[in-house]
């Protein structure tokens, strides 16, 4: 390579890296804003006339959020992705998709909180957690980046409402290895992968 070409490349490289570093937080912030709008659209689905317009999240936008699985749990995409990662840890893709169905079913139900983060953290203050990973006393940071990338892609599709609800409107689920007493009072809607799914007979939140 000619000397002058090498000098040009060396000069351009820091600029390219600097531009990427500057763009990444902007892309992440924009993606989080999109996820919040999509979250609100799901929460307001019982009143479609008032539901906000929301552009879908792209794959690259979703992957820009919480890339290492270490970020605070304070935005819709991170809270949903981390829930799918931990609740379905060791399971198949269908397990993650089904857990996402339950989170969004709750988000769109008047008896549950109005944000994804509030849904997945519900119960941590006064009663047993609705989602066990949130208060099991273990670190919440991701251990497998590739699997977390899959979880984020499923979370993206869920927030975009691109996943068909295969749980039959379930609001609750448990692992096949468990036999919780509460399940006796509910209607089992379906079995998917590692989980059994339920909804209350009167569709009221418990």
Regions flagged by a language model, labelled:
Residues 43-49, 55:
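N-terminal Sec/ER secretory leader and immediately downstream segment
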Residues 24-40:
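Short N-terminal segments immediately surrounding and downstream of signal-peptide cleavage
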Residues 4, 22-25, 54-206:
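Bacterial extracytoplasmic/cell-wall-associated proteins, especially those involved in peptidoglycan
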Residues 14-21:
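N-terminal signal peptide c-region/cleavage motif recognized by signal peptidases
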Residues 9-13:
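Hydrophobic helical h-region of N-terminal Sec-dependent signal peptides
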Residues 19, 36-39, 48:
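Charged, low-complexity intrinsically disordered regions
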Residues 1-8:
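Bacterial N-terminal signal peptides that target proteins for export
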């Amino acid at each position: 390579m000619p000397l002058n070409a090498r000098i040009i490349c060396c000069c351009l490289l820091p600029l390219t890296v600097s531009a990427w570093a500057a763009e990444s937080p902007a892309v992440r912030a924009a993606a989080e804003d999109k996820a919040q709008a999509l979250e609100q659209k799901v929460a307001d689905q019982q009143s479609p006339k008032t539901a906000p317009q929301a552009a879908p999240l792209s794959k690259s936008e979703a992957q820009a959020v919480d890339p290492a699985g270490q970020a605070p749990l304070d935005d819709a995409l991170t809270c949903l992705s981390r829930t799918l990662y931990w609740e379905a840890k060791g399971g198949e893709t269908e397990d993650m998709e089904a857990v996402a169905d339950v989170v969004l079913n709750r988000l769109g139900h008047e008896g549950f909180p109005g944000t994804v983060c509030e849904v997945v953290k519900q119960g941590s203050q006064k009663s047993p957690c609705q989602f066990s990973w949130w208060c099991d006393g273990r670190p919440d940071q991701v251990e497998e980046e590739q699997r977390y990338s899959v979880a984020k892609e499923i979370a993206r599709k869920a927030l975009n409402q691109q996943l068909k609800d295969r749980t039959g409107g379930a609001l609750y689920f448990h692992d096949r290895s468990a036999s919780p007493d509460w399940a006796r009072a509910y209607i089992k809607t379906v079995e998917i992968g590692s989980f059994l799914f339920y909804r209350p007979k009167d569709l009221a939140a418990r």
